[in-house]
Curated annotation (Swiss-Prot):
Role played: May play a role in spermatogenesis.
Region (Disordered): 170-197, 542-572, 782-801, 952-1033, 1293-1347
Location, primary (coarse class): membrane
Protein name (database record): Spermatogenesis-associated protein 31D1
Record key words, sorted: Differentiation, Membrane, Spermatogenesis, Transmembrane, Transmembrane helix
InterPro entries: SPATA31, SPATA31F3-like
Residue stretches of biased makeup (Basic and acidic residues): 1004-1019
UniProt gene name: SPATA31D1
UniProt record, GO biological process: cell differentiation; spermatogenesis
The species this protein was found in: Homo sapiens (Human)
Localization per Swiss-Prot or TrEMBL: Membrane
Topology within the bilayer: Single-pass membrane protein
């Protein structure tokens, strides 16, 4: 070869040289050379094809490597499925190369090719009808021989084979001749003659029988049947024989051909192939019709008239009914002709079970009792039935799976994946060939019913006839029904027996998903059970290849002529009986047993019992059934077997009782767990309960929450059902049921809207069930609320959703009168509740939560009808009786007696919580107040001028009460469930309420209203936190957990434990993004107060209330900071209710950066003011008030409330548009450590209080004044308990920093502060007119304050505050309506960077500031300004104890009389529409203000750089006063206007960038109306 190549190369080089003329000389040599090269190439190809398997394998691997490299850099990257497709192709190549490596050298003869193909075919699986294995064999053939591939492609291709099977009818004949199978051909039938039968030749019979011949144990796989595609043999024209069974019903026969089709060629692969449905579907292979026609032909008398019908493939199901030689015996010299019908157009999905019955005897009687290959094919005949043989039989045989030892684990996994992928692809391709279209049985919604259920339904329908479900491969489930044999024939199955055969198909898990665990093969009275891939329980040593001696059987009387069968040598004939439909026989009656023998053939062990026939145990049945379910689910969803194992172990289907009764009364297994596992009784019980719950979930197919919500729509179950269920099943574990109930309560808590504070007797008595908008507090049954406190616990605050759920369910039931429980049922309510959960688990009905809610509602409904004493007595009796209601008969082994008692007590308290749903402390308070009748009646005639939810704080250390209430201004009813208002009273009210050491922090979450009520027990502090929304559009007004003092001019005090009560109120607006916070606590020596926006005005005293609330000299305590309107407006408001909407506004501190969505603040209505902080984290107000007094609500107040609610609507309409906001900010630098002095105009100092103020505006017709809000009278006991409480910056409200008296005065801080307080004390106790002298307006003198009580409080408080502290003076400055806006924004510029530690500097600053302010404000706007008597200081973040001097501004009427009032650093006050301001908020430093004040027009807007507009209100043209001359330059150097900047973060109240404030030289220009240039 090398010489030839060298010769050719040399001549080629010579001929290709440029100067060579050789091409012209010898052209023939070139042709010869080319021909030689072509021959060499062909020779090389032949050597490559027929080289050794090792070389071929190496070449293929190299080929694959090159292909892989090409794929990596190929051009198909854009194709979505290209990589996966290439991966599958690569795996397929590996599989084929592996199979080729195991094959012997192939000879060139066709016979050798077939044997080699059979060898590889056996390697895959012995199943002759496996489409996937045939495809693999065909691929092997393609690789082995290109020539044979051309002829064999139509026969080995799955698609071609199924196509060739369509619309083809054939007749096979057999003759005694020895014609080889290769000569098999088909011939047409004579047209004039009757339809000839299907005939096979004996040689073909012999050849095909070799497929099922016995084989040694070491060679369990059968040989591959010969493909006779390329070889024909003539038909034997022996007389045809008639089939002994009737034809199919006419409506299932599409047509009966009168003549045969032209001569056709069919291969065995075509015969073995499937139809157009699932290619690897064993269900089609085991179809009764198909199996009868293909595998079994009955012995036919030759004298019968011939009949034939032609069967072709229908497009939706199995195709050609084929006749195989398995129905004949092996060997023999002669043969008899047999015929099988071929029927065309059968729709297997519509064939009734009765129509297949005639196939059954033919399928069974065509076998010999000792012919094992026929048994093997017979088991394929019958459908899967795991429970058709549940009668007193048990399985006696399981097989040993065949192991292919020469295959590694990786190879087996590769084979399995390849088979699955190929099968899935073929299934999809053959079932419609549409993208995403899968057969109905492969869809997820196709329910996989239990085989026993189908068997039961069919058995009931057809009496003794059994129907067998059929399991398909890859999850396909198709039910075909086959009935018992015809009943009118004699049976010679007496010599037969019930056989148990277990099969194994090929590799482990390779084809196990295509087969099914149990198949019942029935033969007369005997049945053979075939089990696939089961667990072996018989040893191999019991196997014996010896066949039993054959038994001669008599001919049936129904057959006119016997049919002699040709059997192998050494065997006697065995004939079978064909039965008719009229005489069904029981398939479970076993007759004469035969000796035990075990035959292993084709990888299948046939194990038959020796003495008795037994069926599978229920546990084994469950195991086999779930084995198939696992494969089905894996093929459907691709879930791993580990995930499916939990379903197999814990969720087996329950046995069907009807099937058990039909199957010789086999008892239902006690344990529902498959297998005999060593489980203890306790674990078994838990598993059973778990399985019950899982079964309920699977039955409903819905999540638990959805199921519970659906169960709410069902009618109420009767009590008798509960009791019956309890008697049947018994009560459950107490702890288990209670835990489940608690879980259900948590899950169902958010199902319906609810509000805990909207309870009323209307809801309980079903008078107003559908009204969920709120209920009046006055209608709440007090006797219901005031039952004994021992019936509830402070831990047991019932979820408000329970009550609403109860009401909703009662509303759905619609029958109030017929559902009440008696006294006896009430006593047994706890026991009934224990059984409700068990009923829910076992019956899947309504949850126990709904039942218990109904019970609670029924019990509570009768409460308002009875007196308080009766209810209390009844509750006590109920509690006593409930001690005997708890069912403890079922002992809980794992709980001690103490824990069981605790559980019982918890159940009792939980029930009472369900009934009452109120905190213990609230009940105690109401009980005490209820007992004080004289105290409650004393408040019955109070007027309601205004409202302010009053929260007091006595000791910030002991407790803080936060109330975030939902406040509405358009409500129709005012619900104050847990609050008792203290109405307007001319004298202080004392209450002997003793709440010593009682404080709860109670938290209740409501998903709808976002109500948060927290109660916790602290040492002696009663705190409550309620979080709600301020909704301006809702229809109810809740002031929960707060005790408002409405329009009170005097403080209502409680002398008992006043120092241990305090509240911190927060009004949080989720709707408007507004937050109203009022923190009344003692922190850093200051005190502030925020009245809530509630307003209640009596219609009778309406005019007087308006006058009193707006024109009093000293405002009511709860209206701190509320000013008086001009005299003209007050006169007009007497006759106009709309004036109640409040022409006076108080705009508190607002966090503008966090109120971008809605910037309008919560404004006070009808003489009340509110403080709003948008984000609940930056604003707090602290103020000391006496502890709250709980006064019972007067029933007459409902009329007053209803009258006020209508007026509140008017207020809302008028103030719906955004109002301008006045902000009171604090420029605390670096930290809030500097204690601020809370100095009141009346001289109240609250010591170490918080850091916030409220700007209060008072409009006077004669001028503008800054009125200090009224401070509460703080008793000595309260003040002595006050301690510094350091709130975080996010909690403390932003407020101007006040100077320390000790630091500014240079002396003793405590003494200086105390003296200053003493100086301001007489001012505090005097009216505004007294403070101002003759310059005060007459309206301020109308109602003088109670000086005695106030002085007493202030003296005691000043004695206690003898330490360094900061006192604030909260003042209010406002311009009269029509006057210019006076933005006295005060702060210190660069001068304040110096530390004022000496008295001299402080005195100088104070003097200069006072002179400047008096001159500036007094001349310009008619306001006398008195500088503070003490220096102010700012702490500067430079590491030094520097201070912030603060200018205190006192705005007086035009007379300009000096006063001692001090204004905070930013007092921007105005009327409702007299100014316009735009506040831009800076981020890290104080904002710079530009303010223009012109003498002839209104003040322009106040601006701040680098911020956002907080509010703008367009001013109206108003007359203005003359401009004020320039102030003293000395004082100007001390003052710089600072905008009430809004903090931008939680730490923004602390501004450390003091140099950014405007400088000294800019003050004169600013105060004269100039603008500031931005400073840096």
């Amino acid at each position: 070869m090398e010489n030839i190549l060298c010769f050719l190369n040399s001549y080629t080089e010579t001929g290709l040289s440029p100067d060579s003329h050789w091409l012209d000389i010898d052209p023939n040599f070139i042709c010869l050379s080319g021909l030689g090269l072509f021959i060499l190439y062909l020779f090389y190809v032949v050597l490559t094809l027929y080289s050794s398997p090792t070389e071929k394998n190496n070449d293929i691997q190299k080929h694959q490597g090159r292909a892989k490299r090409r794929r990596k850099g190929g051009t198909f990257k854009g194709f979505p499925d290209w990589k996966s497709f290439q991966r599958e192709e690569e795996e397929e190549r590996k599989l084929l190369s592996l199979l080729k490596s195991f094959g012997p050298p192939v000879s060139c003869s066709p016979r050798g090719q077939h044997h080699d193909t059979n060898h590889f075919r056996r390697l895959l699986c012995p199943d002759p009808v496996c489409r996937v294995c045939k495809r693999a064999t065909a691929d092997i053939q393609q690789l082995l021989s290109w020539e044979s591939l051309k002829d064999a492609a139509p026969s080995v291709s799955p698609l071609a084979s199924s196509a060739s099977a369509t619309e083809s009818s054939f007749t096979l004949a057999s003759t005694p001749s020895a014609t080889p199978p290769e000569d098999l051909i088909l011939s047409p039938r004579p047209k004039a003659s009757p339809p000839p039968p299907l005939i096979l030749s004996p040689d073909l019979i012999t050849t095909l029988a070799d497929l099922f011949s016995p084989s040694p144990l070491r060679d369990p796989l059968p040989p591959q049947p010969v493909s006779p595609l390329d070889s024909k043999f003539p038909i034997d024209h022996s007389p045809p024989q008639q089939l002994p069974f009737p034809l199919l019903p006419p409506h299932h026969i599409e047509r009966v051909e009168s003549s045969l089709q032209p001569e056709a060629s069919l291969s065995l692969n075509t015969i073995f192939s499937f139809g157009s449905t699932l290619c690897q579907d064993i269900s089609q292979a085991m179809n009764p019709i198909d199996s009868c026609a293909r595998h079994h032909g009955p012995p036919i008398p030759s004298a019968l008239p011939p009949e034939d019908c032609t069967v072709t493939q229908s497009k939706s199901s199995l195709t050609i009914l084929k006749t195989f030689p398995e129905m004949l015996s092996l060997g023999g010299s002669g043969g008899s002709s047999t015929s099988a019908p071929t029927i065309k157009g059968i729709d297997h999905s519509h064939l009734a079970s009765s129509e297949f019955t005639w196939w059954q005897p033919h399928a069974k009687d065509s076998f010999s009792s000792n012919f094992v290959p026929s048994d093997f094919m017979e088991e394929l005949l019958t459908l899967h039935s795991s429970e058709a043989f549940l009668g007193g039989h048990s399985v006696a045989n399981l097989i040993e799976p065949v192991n292919i030892s020469f295959l590694s684990h990786d190879i087996l996994a590769l084979l399995e994946r390849q088979v699955k992928k190929r099968g899935d692809f073929l299934m999809w391709k053959e079932n419609g060939k549409k993208p995403g279209s899968f057969p109905k049985q492969l869809r997820p919604n196709y329910q996989l019913n239990s085989s026993r259920n189908m068997l039961t339904s069919i058995a009931v329908k057809h009496d003794l006839a059994e129907s067998f479900p059929f399991w398909a491969s890859k999850g396909k489930l198709e039910w075909q029904h086959i009935h018992q044999q015809p009943p009118h024939s004699k049976c010679f199955e007496d010599h037969l027996e019930q056989k148990y055969v277990q099969l194994f198909w090929g590799l482990p898990s390779l084809h196990s998903e295509s087969l099914h665990p149990t198949v019942l093969v029935q033969r007369g009275h005997s049945s053979m059970f075939v089990f696939f891939n089961g667990i072996t329980n018989t040893s191999i040593s019991h196997e014996s290849p010896v066949l039993p001696p054959p038994q001669p059987l008599s001919l049936p009387s129904t057959q006119p002529l016997p049919l002699p069968q040709t059997l192998p040598q050494g065997q006697s004939p065995h004939l079978t009986q064909v039965k008719s439909l009229a005489q069904p026989q029981s398939p479970f009656r076993a007759l004469l047993p035969s000796p035990l023998f075990l035959i292993r053939i084709c990888g299948v062990c046939f194990h038959r019992p020796q003495n008795e026939a037994r069926s599978l145990l229920p546990s084994e049945i469950n195991h086999l059934e779930w084995n198939v379910l696992q494969k089905v689910q894996e093929s459907l969803w691709g879930l791993p077997s580990v995930v499916q194992k939990s379903q197999e172990d814990f969720c087996p289907p329950a046995p069907n009782p009807e099937l058990v009764r039909k199957s010789f009364k086999v008892h239902v297994p006690i344990s529902i767990i498959p297998g005999d596992f060593p489980l203890s009784s306790e674990v078994r019980k838990k598993l059973e309960q778990h399985i019950r719950r899982r079964l309920i979930q699977r039955r409903w197919g819905l999540p638990r929450r959805i199921h519970e919500s659906l169960s709410l729509l069902r009618p109420q179950s009767k009590i008798s059902e509960l009791s019956v269920s309890e008697r049947i099943h018994g009560p459950l574990n107490i702890s288990l049921v209670e835990g489940q109930r608690c879980n259900v309560l948590k899950k169902s808590a958010s199902s319906f809207p609810r509000s805990f504070h909207e309870r009323s007797s209307n809801m309980l008595s079903m008078e107003n069930v559908g009204n969920y908008q709120g209920y009046s507090q006055e209608t709440v049954p007090k006797d219901h609320l005031l039952h004994g406190p021992e019936t509830s616990s402070d831990k047991d605050l019932r979820s408000n959703s329970e009550r609403d759920l109860e009401t909703h369910m009662m509303h759905l039931s619609g029958n109030d009168s017929g559902v009440r429980l008696g006294q006896k049922q009430l006593e047994n309510a706890l026991t009934v509740r224990l059984s409700k959960k068990f009923e829910e688990i076992n019956e899947g009905r309504m949850p126990g939560t709904v039942h218990s809610s109904w019970h609670s509602v029924k019990q509570t409904m009768s409460l308002p009808e009875k007196s308080h004493s009766q209810i209390k007595h009844r509750n006590l009796v109920t509690l006593v009786s409930e001690d005997h209601c708890v069912d403890t008969s079922q002992e809980i082994s794992f709980l001690s007696s103490n824990k069981q008692k605790m559980l019982e007590a918890h159940i009792k308290t939980f029930r009472m919580r369900m009934l009452w749903g109120l905190p213990l402390k609230v009940l105690e308070s109401i009980e005490i107040f209820k007992s004080k009748a004289d105290l409650s009646t004393s408040f019955s005639h109070f007027d309601l001028p205004s409202s302010a939810t009053f929260i007091s704080q006595g000791d910030s250390k002991d407790g803080v009460s936060k109330s975030r209430s939902r406040s509405t201004f358009q409500g129709e009813k005012l619900g104050t469930t847990s609050s008792v208002p203290i109405l307007d009273r001319p004298h202080p009210v004392s209450s002997p309420v003793v709440q010593e050491g009682q404080g709860t922090l109670r938290r209740q979450f409501s998903d709808t209203d976002h109500d948060l009520i927290e109660t916790d027990s602290k040492d002696g502090a009663s705190t409550s936190l309620r979080r709600g929304t301020t909704d301006f559009q809702s229809e109810k007004l809740d002031s929960t957990s707060s005790f408002p003092i409405l329009g009170h001019s005097y403080l209502v005090t409680s002398p008992v434990n006043q120092e241990k009560q305090g509240t911190l109120r927060r009004e949080f607006s989720d709707t408007d993004n507004d937050l109203t916070e009022s923190v009344r606590t003692t922190e850093d020596g200051r005190q502030t107060f925020l009245p809530p926006p509630h307003s209640i005005v009596d219609e009778v005293s309406q005019k007087q209330t308006v006058l009193a609330s707006r024109c009093s000299a000293e405002l009511p305590i709860m209206q701190a900071g509320a000013g008086c309107e001009s005299w003209d407006k007050r006169k007009s408001s007497f006759h106009n209710v709309d004036r109640l909407q409040g022409s006076r506004k108080t705009f508190p501190v607002t966090n503008a950066l966090q109120s971008q969505t809605r910037n309008n603040l919560t404004t006070s209505k009808s003489g009340s003011c509110s403080l709003t902080n948008v984000k609940a984290s930056t604003s707090n107000e602290t103020e000391i008030f006496p502890p709250r007094i709980s006064v019972p609500q007067d029933p007459k107040s409902s009329y007053l409330k209803n009258q006020m609610l209508s007026q509140l609507k008017l207020v809302q309409r008028k103030h719906s548009q955004p109002q301008s906001h006045f902000t009171d900010m604090s420029f605390a630098l670096d930290n809030l450590s500097s204690k601020d002095l809370l100095t009141n105009s009346q001289g109240i100092s609250s010591g170490d209080m918080g850091t916030s103020q409220v700007v209060h505006v008072h409009l006077e017709d004669s001028g503008i004044r800054v009125a200090q809000k009224q401070e509460p009278r703080v008793p000595t006991c309260v003040l002595q308990k006050c301690q510094v409480t350091n709130f975080p910056p996010a909690v403390n409200r932003v407020s101007p920093v006040r100077p320390k008296g000790g630091e500014l005065d240079g002396g003793d801080a405590g003494l200086g502060t105390s003296q200053r307080r003493r100086k301001s004390l007489p001012v505090h106790n005097k009216t505004s007119g007294e403070v101002l002298g003759s310059k005060s307006s007459p309206t301020l003198k109308t109602q003088p304050p109670p000086e005695n009580l106030f002085r007493k409080w202030m003296k005691t408080s000043l004695q206690w505050f003898n330490k360094p502290s900061i006192s604030y003076e909260e003042q209010e400055s406002s311009w009269e309506k029509g006057s210019s806006l006076s933005s006295c924004v005060q702060n210190i510029g660069r001068v304040i960077r110096a530390a004022f530690t000496g008295t001299t500097e402080a005195q100088k600053i104070r003097k200069d500031t006072r002179e400047f302010l008096e001159e500036k404000l007094g001349h310009r706007h008619g306001i006398d300004i008195t500088c503070p008597q003490e220096p102010l200081s700012f702490p500067v973040g430079l590491g030094k104890a520097q201070h912030n001097p603060e200018v205190h501004v006192r705005a007086e009427p035009v007379q300009g009389c000096p006063c001692n009032y001090r204004a905070p650093s930013c007092k921007v006050t105005r009327t409702k529409s007299c100014s316009q301001q735009a506040i831009f908020v800076g981020q890290n430093y104080p904002t710079r203000i530009r303010q223009i004040i012109d003498k002839d027009r209104q003040p322009q807007k106040v601006e701040a750089f680098k911020g956002k507009i907080l509010c703008q209100s367009h001013p109206q043209s108003m007359p203005h006063r003359k401009p004020v001359p320039h102030p003293n330059p000395t004082c100007r150097r001390q003052v710089s206007l600072v905008c009430p900047a809004v903090p931008t973060s939680a730490k923004s109240p602390v501004f450390s960038d003091v140099p950014f404030l405007t400088g000294q030289k800019m003050l004169p220009k600013h105060l004269q109306g100039g603008k500031f240039p931005p400073t840096k």
